[in-house]
C-alpha cells in the first residue's frame, strides 16, 4: 500500500532515507533521499488567463483556505490570492473569475482578509454561540485590490469558509455567484476540547478530546449558511446536480435560522448586477449543451441506487455498452 510506503519514507527534516528500487530487468539500485518539507503547488492558489472574443479574463483557483496557524505572517491563502490578483492586473484582464468549487473551507481570518480585496471596508461575517452575543468580523482596510467585474464559481462541495466568502460578496452585490443550485450548507464552527485540561487530579490516564459544535456562521444579511448554503445567482448544471451531497442530507443536521442583519453599504445599486444575471440566465436556457448536462445529471441520479448486476454475461455487456454510450454524450 502506498500509505505504508509513505509512512516509512517520512521523517525528520535533514535526515536521509534509502530507497531500494528493483528495475524491470531484476537488478536493484539504492537511492538516497534527504528528507525535507514538500509543498504541493496544486494545493495553493494559482491563476491563469482565458482569452475569448478578443477579451482577457483572469481565473483564480483556490482549493482551500490554508494558513500556518503558528505564524499568520507565513504563506497563506489570502496573501497568495493577493499576489495572483496583482499578476492578473499586470496582464490587463477585464474581469476575474474566482473558482471556489470543491473548496471545503479552512481559515476564517483568510476569508475576512480576502473579501476585503474586493470591497472598501465593512462587515464580512457574523459568528454567534448558543446564548452568546454575536461577533462581527470586518474588513477594516480601505484599500481595494480589484474593483473590476467579479464572478465567484461554486458547487455542491464548496463549504464553510467558501460559503462565507461567496455569501459576503453576494450580499454586497460585489460578485455574481455562479454554479450549482446551492453550496454544501455547512454553517457551524467546531472546537476541539482537551478533556485532560478540564479534569484536575486525573488518575485515569489520557482522557482524550471531544469535538464540539460551538458556534454558527451568519451572513451579514442575518441569514445562516447552515443547510441552505449560498444560492447561486446563475445556476449552471453539472453531472452531480441531483445527487444528495449537502449538509441537509446528513444525519441530524442543525436547523437553519437567522439573526439580525448588520449594517453595510452595497457595492452596486443593483441595475447592472441584475441585468448581467438575467442575460446570463437567458443564454443558459437557450444553450443545448447545458440542457444535455442537465439530462445527464438526472440520469446519474436515476442510477444512484442501481446495484443490480446481471450474471448473464451478454446481458451485462449490453447494459455496460448502453451506459458507456450515455456517458459519452
Residue spans of the language-model regions?
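Polar, glycine-rich mid-to-C-terminal structural blocks
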Residues: 161, 173, 178-245
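Conserved functional hotspot residues or short segments at active or partner-binding sites
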Residues: 219-329
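A general structural signal for short secondary-structure boundary/capping elements
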Residues: 142-146, 198-203, 256-264, 277
Amino acid at each position: 500500500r502506498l500509505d505504508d510506503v509513505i509512512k516509512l519514507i517520512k521523517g525528520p527534516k535533514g535526515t536521509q532515507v534509502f530507497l531500494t528500487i528493483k528495475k524491470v530487468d531484476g537488478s536493484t539500485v539504492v537511492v538516497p533521499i534527504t528528507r525535507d518539507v514538500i509543498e504541493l503547488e496544486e494545493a495553493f492558489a494559482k491563476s491563469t488567463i482565458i482569452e475569448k472574443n478578443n477579451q482577457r479574463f483572469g481565473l483564480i483557483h483556490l482549493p482551500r483556505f490554508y494558513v500556518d496557524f503558528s505564524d499568520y505572517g507565513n504563506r497563506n491563502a489570502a496573501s497568495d490570492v493577493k499576489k495572483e490578483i496583482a499578476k492578473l492586473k499586470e496582464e490587463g484582464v477585464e474581469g476575474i473569475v474566482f473558482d471556489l468549487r470543491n473548496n471545503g473551507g479552512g481559515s476564517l481570518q483568510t476569508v475576512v482578509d480576502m473579501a476585503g480585496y474586493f470591497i472598501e471596508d465593512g462587515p464580512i461575517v457574523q459568528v454567534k454561540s448558543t446564548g452568546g452575543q454575536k461577533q462581527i468580523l470586518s474588513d477594516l482596510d480601505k484599500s481595494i485590490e480589484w474593483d473590476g467585474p467579479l464572478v465567484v464559481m461554486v458547487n455542491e462541495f464548496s463549504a464553510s469558509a467558501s460559503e462565507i466568502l461567496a455569501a459576503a460578496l453576494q450580499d454586497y452585490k460585489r460578485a455574481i455567484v455562479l454554479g450549482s443550485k446551492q453550496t454544501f450548507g455547512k454553517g457551524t464552527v467546531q472546537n476541539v476540547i482537551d478533556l485532560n485540561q478540564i479534569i484536575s487530579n486525573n488518575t485515569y490516564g489520557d482522557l482524550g478530546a471531544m469535538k464540539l459544535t460551538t458556534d454558527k456562521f451568519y451572513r451579514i444579511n442575518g441569514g445562516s449558511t447552515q443547510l441552505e448554503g449560498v444560492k447561486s445567482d446563475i445556476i449552471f448544471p453539472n453531472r452531480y446536480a441531483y445527487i444528495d451531497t449537502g449538509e441537509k442530507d446528513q444525519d441530524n443536521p442543525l436547523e437553519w435560522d437567522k439573526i439580525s442583519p448588520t449594517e453595510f453599504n452595497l457595492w452596486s445599486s443593483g441595475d447592472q448586477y441584475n441585468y448581467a444575471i438575467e442575460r446570463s440566465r437567458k443564454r443558459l436556457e437557450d444553450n443545448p449543451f447545458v440542457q444535455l448536462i442537465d439530462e445527464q445529471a438526472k440520469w446519474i441520479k436515476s442510477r444512484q441506487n442501481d446495484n443490480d448486476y446481471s450474471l448473464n454475461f451478454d446481458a451485462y455487456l449490453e447494459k455496460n455498452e448502453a451506459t458507456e454510450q450515455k456517458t459519452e454524450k
